[in-house]
Design a protein with these regions (language model features):
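Conserved alpha/beta-hydrolase
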Residues: 40, 47-69
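Catalytic histidine-centered segment of alpha/beta-hydrolase-like enzymes
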Residues: 210-220
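Hydrolase active-site cap/lid region
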Residues: 110-158
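Alpha/beta-hydrolase active-site loop
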Residues: 72-93
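N-terminal cap/lid segment of alpha/beta-hydrolase-fold proteins
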Residues: 1-24
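Gly/Ala-rich beta-loop-alpha elbow adjacent to hydrolase catalytic centers
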Residues: 96-105
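Short beta-strand/loop motif that positions the catalytic acidic residue
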Residues: 171-173, 178-180, 184
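Short alpha-helix in the alpha/beta-hydrolase fold that links the catalytic acid
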Residues: 165, 174, 188-197
Length: 225
């Protein structure tokens, strides 16, 4: 049943409201998680394919993304949103995450999200590398990267690197499919290989010529999911 229902839910842990999309109707549910500066509807081609296979999909706009309010967000809020959605809509058969959404899915699994398998597409890996790359693109001085890390650790406690994807991968027991494009300019394909190296059960699929976003609509990649 191809019907999309939009709702708002409160994520109590972060005291923010997010917009959520239910697509289809089934007892078998899949959670879809968009990436940085993305929105829930970005994964629509994947949702269409899953619908044909009898799954219902739940996607959402993270705080400050898509139709959700706010002017800033960080991965901790993505993870809190995933865990709140599981409470209200779970259990999910599996989870699919793109880019920062892939990192968030692995971290949510580390924090006890219960899924039978996960798919991560164009996922980032080491947080300090991502920050350093961002600082470089903005042509800021490298010490800003250290300041950002110190600010994060002072505010949230613990080490920032604990949220890196490879660290979450080490704690992940379920099978994970890692999909990444060789020509991804936003996130190097090295991230995929390093994440896979730290997973206990994994498959890797490397595409070519699709970059960071087109991969979400690629038939071959979608068929593998």
């Amino acid at each position: 049943e191809r019907e999309s229902v939009q709702k708002s839910i409160e994520v109590s842990e972060i005291q923010k409201e997010i917009v959520l999309y239910e697509y289809g109707k089934s007892n078998k549910k899949v959670l879809l998680v968009h990436g940085w500066s993305g929105r829930g509807t970005q994964l629509v081609k994947i949702a269409d394919e899953l619908l044909k296979m009898g799954y219902m999909t739940i996607s959402f706009d993270a705080p400050a993304h898509g139709k959700s309010k706010g002017n800033s967000s960080i991965m901790i809020e993505f993870i809190a949103s995933i865990l709140e959605i599981e409470k209200q809509y779970g259990p999910f058969e599996f989870a699919v995450g793109h880019s920062l959404g892939g990192m968030s899915v692995l971290n949510a699994i580390k924090q006890n999200l219960q899924v039978k398998k996960a798919v991560i597409i164009g996922s980032g890996d080491i947080i300090q590398d991502i920050i350093d790359d961002f600082i470089c693109k903005l042509q800021l001085r490298p010490e800003y990267g250290i300041k950002l890390r110190n600010h994060f650790e002072a505010k949230f406690g613990g080490k920032m690197d604990d949220y890196s994807a490879y660290k979450a991968a080490e704690k992940t027991e379920i099978p994970v499919l890692v999909i990444h494009d060789k020509d991804d300019d936003d996130v190097s394909v090295k991230a995929a290989y390093n994440i896979q190296k730290h997973l206990k059960q994994s498959e890797i699929m490397i595409t070519e010529g699709l970059g960071h976003r087109k991969i979400l609509g690629d038939e071959t990649a979608i068929q593998n999911i």
